[in-house]
Amino acid sequence: PKVMGIETEYGITVRNQPDFNPILSSLLLINSYETYRSSRIRWDYEAESPLRDARGFEYAEDKDVPSKEESRLINLILSNGARFYVDHAHPEYSSPETTNPRDCVIWDKAGERILNLSRSRAEAVSPPEQRILIYKNNTDFKGNSQGNHENYLMDRKVPFARIVQYLMPFFASRQIFTG
């Protein structure tokens, strides 16, 4: 069976907050859910590095890469196997891996409920006139699109040129057979 999952980027804004900051609002959202849950599952980055590029090299140290403590504050691994986290300046939910489309939809809907519960809890600790708005599959005011995106699992030993050679024709033609 093929392993699949859905990774959804959500837009966020706060009504009646003149100094709105999407990063801080996303952090509040994520950590409101964490407060609801009693335990925290740690994310294991042992075999990965955010500085390792798919083309086979590593970047020099990046000041924008979060420390382990910062990473703990912006990442939640949920008991259902999903990941709920701040990705740049928006909340993101990555469903657990499944082996069929039905389960994929079930866990995507679970993500929507988690976002709504988090929003409700975050609003409870916010000033009463502020309302948190979460958007699924949208574009922000700068023209950045947010929605679903896909990931492909492959061995790091595969040369980047080979990835490009085989994936580019697929990316260019998939609209024909997937719509």
Task: Kindly give the residue locations of the regions a language model identified.
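A short alpha->loop->secondary-structure connector
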Residues: 159-161
